[in-house]
């Protein structure tokens, strides 16, 4: 009669049952995460958003307006794609964006309507190449 280790077999069966249970059970559906452009991680967005839009003053500060006026094309595209065109990403209303942008005189610069305007049309292939270059520079 062959010797079988019951502990090993029972551990293997328990592990198999655990994996089957995980695959059979339906996962809770999570709300879709916004697609974040990797180039936007390099743009200094948190400071601009915090300084200008999370502040509840009726008139934006001079520093806020200067930051908005001197923001680069990448920053404008990232703000349009991730915050202004989708206000639910930052829990800031569209009226707040409009108020701050109008008060600072940059309403035309930040005029993006859900991605159909010219703002926010970042080239995805170029962004992925930049990310690939950054990752490759870490290894070589």
Curated annotation (Swiss-Prot):
A lipid is attached at residue 115 (GPI-anchor amidated glycine). Belongs to the plant LTP family. InterPro entries: Bifun_inhib/LTP/seed_sf, Bifunc_inhib/LTP/seed_store. This is Non-specific lipid transfer protein GPI-anchored 33. It comes from Arabidopsis thaliana (Mouse-ear cress). Its main location: membrane. It is found in: Cell membrane. Residues 116-140 form a propeptide. Probable lipid transfer protein. Residues 1-27 form the signal peptide. The gene is LTPG33. The keyword Signal applies.
